[in-house]
Regions:
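Conserved alpha/beta catalytic core and glycan-binding cleft of carbohydrate-active enzymes
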Residues: 318-320, 335-501, 529-600, 607-608
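C-terminal beta-strand-rich structural cap/linker in extracellular carbohydrate-active enzymes
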Residues: 612-652
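Short proline/glycine-enriched turn/loop motifs at strand-loop junctions of beta-rich domains
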Residues: 44-51, 588-591
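Conserved, mostly hydrophobic/aromatic
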Residues: 43, 107, 169, 196, ...
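Catalytic cores of secreted or luminal carbohydrate-active enzymes
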Residues: 512-534
Length: 693
């Protein structure tokens, strides 16, 4: 990335909060001056008395490289590139290689009270590995991308009516070396790409890859917003990881933290001796619950810093979207604060009008300049119109995590099945608001830590019931309206909670139950990806119809999902360990049901109760439906049926079936499934686990 110097208009945009490429005018950049290669450094420190550039190249001496103040509060200096070469005395720097670059630097800033403090570059493209905190000069240009086809296709990508199935992961704990050290970006690519492709995920979401000083923060307390973390290698190696995923047909979302930043002395806190990035009043500038500072979006320079950062990761790293963390804390001044601990806005309300304006500007800019990407809000309140267009008064996000659905579902599955009938509303209430936003259904990292138990261990009962309940939950989730997200380890039934400082327990795949649930997830992913009824209409009642919503006594729900061509899939879930060999359901039209997926099948570790033939409906009214039939409903299981409707008298064209997902070919039609007989076993051996290298 070459530096050409900002124009007056560009500087004005920076201060107004509309500059989306502020990283081109600030930070460290290679330049050419009179034929000589140089490095240009620029930092915004409007209230500083003096600023010096310090680093290995000048033995961290603040007297050697003073910077000059520009009229708008930035400080600049330009040095020959050879300044950063080890030349005459490599031993002086403890470097055995005389060609090594002296890349580390900081800004030494004098406050108005005369004190000095060393700060990392807010716009630095690389940083040292923790516990060291210096920035590193790094030229991002020169990487040769191989994902041109992906990037071109993304311009016309419509995620709202496409399958979106996200594998959320933490790069530092997915897998590690035997000695406990991190895999590099390159090593992660070698193992992750084939695994995700084999499992059938459409996207992967990386928890924050921006530099952060504390592993325990999981990356959510960022110190280097423009720097890929050095834990796993160089920035261009992260580019190569994303490139490899794109070439395999897998999208990449990045977690992004624009709400708050840590109080580390080397970071943004009181950057020039005064609050530059945070609000000066702690009632707005502090977040006591997290021990961090909140960004002050009333400042134009802060707006440009974060707007540019969002665009930076989409442009330079080819990210396919950002999952925006802690949006609720940005929207509300009273988030996690008691009365008296926050200041109202100018109208007396609790809404942060400046942050709301920033989010709208950011989404408008991103969707204009990067068509086909996904902007996802982690927003946990009932704030309206998060995913509605800005011109209608919305925030302009593409998707929002459905935290209400997630909390209800996890509370429900923790209950002993005996008591679930008293909480049946937790299964059905989500449809009261399911189409008010564009939702993602998240079983994320936050739900498998801090004593909440793993997805498997949340299930009550013995091991068989735990695994059966988990498979039933995954089957139900895949059919529920909304895009999907599952945190790593959940796909094979990780038994203990997630640990950020250790790899997943991959050895569990040596035990039969875990590869069986992994195979179940793989099959569900395949069905979801190839069945338009499950993803084409996630945003209206046109794609969903309750078949059985009120059977609380049996804790059974059933519903139809329908695609734009009228093809329907019936989902039936039994949340108790009671087997129902003849369960009567109503249907809106005469037709044929054919079981195409069943979490109770033997190959997934189930009891192998299923519907062995095509089932014809009968003209017998049940509830509000004129037609009905009996089906076999296994214990703690989800069953999918293709629903081939007979043509109505006024229709000349027969509705199509969904042939892509039929596991069991239709046999001789039977009116009921009163005496289901098991098919011959497909395999008597153990389930195969998915290889991860």
């Amino acid at each position: 990335m070459r530096y050409n110097g900002p124009t007056a208009a560009v500087r004005d945009q920076f201060h107004q909060g509309t500059n989306r490429r502020a990283y081109e005018m600030l930070g460290a950049h290679p330049v050419t001056q009179d034929g000589q290669e140089m490095w240009h450094f620029a930092v915004w420190a409007p209230n500083a008395r003096a600023v010096s550039l310090i680093g290995e190249f000048n033995q961290w001496d603040k007297e050697k490289t003073p910077m000059q103040k520009v009229y708008d509060g930035t400080w600049e200096v330009r040095l020959p590139a050879e300044t950063f070469d080890v030349k005459s005395d490599p031993k002086r720097y403890d470097y055995p290689d005389a060609a090594k670059k002296l890349t580390t630097y900081k800004y030494c800033i004098q406050a108005q009270d005369g004190t000095w403090q060393d700060k990392a570059d807010p716009y630095g493209f690389a940083m040292q590995m923790r516990p060291d905190t210096a920035s590193r000069i790094y030229d991002l240009s020169g990487y040769r991308w191989g994902d041109a086809d992906w990037m071109e296709a993304r311009k016309s990508y419509d995620p709202y009516h496409s399958p979106v199935n996200i594998y959320e992961m933490h790069l530092g704990s997915w897998r590690r070396h035997k000695d406990g050290t991190f895999l590099t970006y390159t090593e992660i690519a070698e193992q992750l790409v084939p695994y995700l492709k084999e499992m059938g995920y459409t996207h992967v979401e990386f928890m924050p890859v921006m530099e952060h000083p504390l592993d325990m923060s999981w990356g959510y307390q960022v110190s280097g917003y423009y720097a890929a973390t050095a834990r796993f290698g160089e920035p261009k190696e992260l580019m190569a990881l994303i490139d490899a995923l794109h070439q395999a047909g897998i999208g990449v979302l990045l977690d992004w933290v624009p709400a708050h930043f840590p109080r580390d002395a080397m970071g943004l806190r009181r950057f020039d001796g005064t609050p530059c990035y945070e609000h000066p009043d702690p009632r707005r500038g502090d977040m006591p619950q997290w021990g961090t500072h909140m960004f002050d979006y009333a400042r134009g320079e802060v707006n440009s810093f974060m707007l540019s950062n969002a665009c930076f990761w989409l442009e330079w790293y080819h990210a396919d979207g950002l999952r925006v963390d802690a949006v609720t804390s940005m929207l509300m001044y009273d988030f996690c604060r008691e009365p008296g601990q926050w200041l109202p806005n100018k109208y007396g309300g609790h809404e942060n009008l400046d942050a709301i304006a920033f989010l709208r500007r950011m989404n408008e800019t991103v969707y204009r300049d990067f068509p086909g990407v996904m902007m996802v809000a982690e927003e946990s309140s009932a704030y309206p119109m998060v995913t509605r267009p800005i011109y209608l008064g919305g925030l302009g996000f593409g998707f929002k995590w459905n935290m209400g659905w997630m909390n209800d579902m996890l509370a429900y599955i923790k209950l002993d099945p005996v008591y679930r009938k008293y909480h049946h509303d937790k299964l059905t209430f989500s449809l009261m608001y399911a189409f008010s936003e564009n939702y993602i259904l998240p079983f994320s990292h936050d739900e498998v830590v801090h004593g909440k138990h793993s997805m498997l261990d949340k299930q009550p009962g013995d091991l068989w019931k735990k695994f059966a309940g988990l498979r039933a939950l995954y089957g139900y989730t895949m059919a529920h309206p909304g895009k999907k997200l599952l945190f790593m380890g959940g796909e094979f039934g990780h038994f203990i909670e997630w640990k950020y400082d250790d790899q997943l327990d991959w050895f569990l795949l040596l035990y039969e139950n875990h590869p069986q649930v992994q195979q179940c997830c793989k099959r569900l992913n395949e069905i979801y990806r190839t069945t338009p009824a499950l993803y084409q209409i996630d945003d209206s009642w046109d794609g969903f119809q309750w078949i059985q919503a009120n059977d609380s006594d049996n804790s059974i729900v059933a519903f139809l999902r329908t695609d734009k061509r009228g093809n329907s899939l019936l989902c039936v879930t039994n949340f108790t360990p009671v087997f129902h060999p003849q369960y009567r359901i109503g249907l809106p039209q005469m037709g044929t049901l054919t079981e195409c997926f069943n979490t109770d099948r033997k190959e997934y570790g189930g009891s192998n109760q299923y519907n062995n033939w095509a089932i014809r409906t009968e003209e017998e009214q049940l509830q509000d439906f004129q037609y009905s039939c009996d089906i076999c409903v296994p214990p703690l299981a989800t069953v999918y049926f293709t629903y081939q409707r007979d043509p109505l008298p006024e229709k000349a064209k027969k509705a199509r079936v969904i042939p892509e997902i039929a596991d069991v070919p239709p046999k001789k039609a039977s009116k009921t499934a009163k005496n289901p007989q098991p098919l011959p076993e497909k395999s008597a051996g153990k389930a195969n686990s998915i290889s991860i290298g």
